[in-house]
Amino acid sequence: MERYDKATLNAAFAPEFRQNEGSLTSTLRTLLFFTALMITLPVGLYFSSKAYIFEGTLGMSNRDSYFYAAIVAVVTVHVVLAMFVYVAWSEGTRQWREGKQD
């Protein structure tokens, strides 16, 4: 049996670990970006569309503006989710293709 020291083992597994670490960092960064979008964008668009578009520009009542602003927020959530699925799918197929070429 051969004995391996730590330097030899680290040199053997370092490129694979670095590739996985980069992939994990990229995935985490994407997830955090879309999490921030999912929290801020629908809430921000809800209040801004309610105040500036529906009540301010269109002159709707307070009750009607709640309803239409909620629709804007729900549509925004669906758009952000669709964007996340597209980016995750593209990133996954890119990583799969890179793995197949090795």
From Swiss-Prot:
Give the coiled coil ranges: none
Q: Cite the ranges annotated as topological domain Lumenal.
A: 52-66
Q: Specify the domain of life of the species encoding this protein.
A: Eukaryota
| BP GO annotations | vacuolar proton-transporting V-type ATPase complex assembly
TM region(s), chain numbering: 31-51, 67-87
UniProt keyword terms in alphabetical order: Cytoplasmic vesicle, Endoplasmic reticulum, Membrane, Transmembrane, Transmembrane helix
Q: Which residues lie on this side of the membrane: Cytoplasmic?
A: 1-30, 88-102
Q: Which GO terms describe its cellular component?
A: endoplasmic reticulum membrane; endoplasmic reticulum-Golgi intermediate compartment membrane; ER to Golgi transport vesicle membrane; lysosome
Subcellular location per UniProt equals:
Endoplasmic reticulum membrane; Endoplasmic reticulum-Golgi intermediate compartment membrane; Cytoplasmic vesicle, COPII-coated vesicle membrane
Q: How does it sit in the membrane?
A: Multi-pass membrane protein
To which protein family does this belong?
Belongs to the VMA21 family.
Function description: Required for the assembly of the V0 complex of the vacuolar ATPase (V-ATPase) in the endoplasmic reticulum.
The name of this protein is Vacuolar ATPase assembly integral membrane protein VMA21
> What are the leading ranks of the lineage?
Eukaryota, Metazoa, Chordata, Craniata, Vertebrata
